[in-house]
Amino acid sequence: MKNLYLICLLFIISACGTPTTEDRITFSQVDPFLKVFRESNFFPEYNETEEVAAGEHATFQFAVRAALPLKELSAQVTAFTNEKGTQLQSSPRTGFVDYVRVGRQTPDRAKDAITSLSHYYPDPIIEQNGQSVTRDVAQPIWISVPVPTNAEAGTYKATFSLKGKMGNQTFELKKEISVKVYPIVMPQPDLWVTNWFGTSPDKMKIFNGGKEVEPYSDVYWEMVQELADKMKECYSNVILLSPLEHIEFEEKDGTYTFDYSRFDKMIDIFHRAGVLKMLEGGHIAGRTGDWSSQFAPYVPRYENGKKKLVQYPMESEQAVNFYRQFIPSLAAHLKEAYPKVLYAQHIADEPTSDNIKSYVAIARFVKQQCPDIKIIEACHTHDLENILDIWVPQLNFYKEGYDFYRERQKQG
């Protein structure tokens, strides 16, 4: 009898078998609009064909999750091919979605706001293979397929594969994905799109994987070029550059001279990249204290060979002398070197009703030196004595002053 029980037990064990690597991994295509959180464990299957116009981007999202750690993950996509064997002349891009922790939620959130229990939200896409994922944590994978404007209409199919290791075992998971291209060509966007960026040493160090970058070195300029190319991909066409940061100054007996070579090189890089529909001049003033404090302009000064921006009241001798020379020089240089580039100058960011007086004083002084210069600003109030040429209100302030801003639009 014991032998019979033992035989039955062995039969049951052998029938169950050893679970394969694939059995321990959840791998699903999901809706690109689905927010996959770190703690997500249910992925509604999504097998839709993505529909796009020529000139548009098709996007796909996959999610992977396992009971054991995953290592050395790599994602690949084969060429998209239609039934006639014609391939889309594009290079699909893959990336692993990373997360950013939100320490404080927005007050008065929408009723349908999607909340992450961990407070980690998907944001950057890391276009680099070799990623690792801890056990029981979801990892979304993003695929972007640029469709050429001359693409032939029809349905194109490709295979997405995810390779990696779980424990000592390697695995490869595959899914077919498809794109339907309609006989419509998507025109280039005509919106004005700005994405502010910084090239200060601390920012460039982050971009360079934690390694220091000498300002204006060969590596620095290579990274600026990469940044310009990336902004082109994202349809940015308005670039913010700080004249005070990139222009060199020399003062002798109260008279200034200006070296525009680095500033011009920055402009040239973004101009060649095709992202310079308009140039924003970075802010020349800032708050002197807390949020409600008054504004004061910056005046450059060199200490031990390094440029330092020092704030002085607008009515001070230092500020008046510097900007009386700098603004006309800047305007004349831009007109001569870049006659086709639209230029708008920021004064100070987001003026409010508390610091209107100092903001208007600085803006009026700038206008007095160069009446043709355009002033652009993100603003919390429209009570700025009509000193702005380009108003950029936050949406809530746009709602409050809707009639005012509509009137500005009518006036051009």
Task: Put a short name on every predicted segment.
Residues S14-A15:
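C-terminal motif of bacterial Sec signal peptides marking the signal peptidase cleavage site
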Residues E48-E72, V219-E222, E226, M231:
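Solvent-exposed, low-complexity, repeat-rich "mucin-like" stalks and linkers
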Residues G130, P146, K157-G164, F171-Q369, ...:
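Aromatic-lined carbohydrate-binding surfaces of glycoside hydrolases
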Residues A67-P69, P146-A153:
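Short, surface-exposed loop/turn segments at beta-strand-coil junctions that are enriched for proline
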Residues Q325, E385-G412:
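Glycoside hydrolase catalytic-domain groove-lining segments
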Residues P44-Y46, G55-Q61, Q139, E152-T159:
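Short, solvent-exposed loop/turn segments enriched in Ser/Thr/Gly
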Residues T21-P44, A67-I143:
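Surface-exposed binding patches on compact interaction domains or structured appendages
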Residues K2-L9:
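Sec-dependent signal peptide recognition
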